């Protein structure tokens, strides 16, 4: 099936970076997918559909973001059947998007480019600490706490009935 899509000379691939902020950070990944599909339909872009028994919009997403996490660097690839000028496509997507899920940038890429999930192999998080002004904590204390966590090489935690171990040797590669 992917060969049919990549061999099609009239197929265009628009890579869009978008943000997931404020109220919409509480949407799950499937809800984000459905919302983006509605945005594309409202924008009137000529999207491609998959082949097969149950055709659906040909769009690929980066890895799922944890529910409740804001981001300004989420991605999706939209396959289109007709070329639309980049400024026009971006403007139509922006006009059809809610502010908390708006596109930040877009670019056409080669249709044969590997999927986003194959390209994005690392995630980077920024944590903003909102500390109590009555009990100030210095940056050195925060760094020492992280170093203590790393010295144990992991954190055991329970999620539901399963207990897991988060490997911090690979998770906390660098921090400021």
Q: Where do the PLM segments sit?
A:
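Charged, low-complexity intrinsically disordered regulatory segments in eukaryotic signaling
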Residues: 1-8
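Short, flexible turn/loop "capping" segments at secondary-structure junctions
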Residues: 8-9, 68-72, 118-120
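Extended, well-folded interaction surfaces typified by the phenylalanyl-tRNA synthetase beta subunit core
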Residues: 11-12, 17-19, 23, 27, ...
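Short glycine-/aliphatic-rich beta-strand segments at the starts of folded cytosolic domains
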Residues: 13-20, 76-78, 121-130
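Short, charge-patterned binding micro-sites
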Residues: 48-81
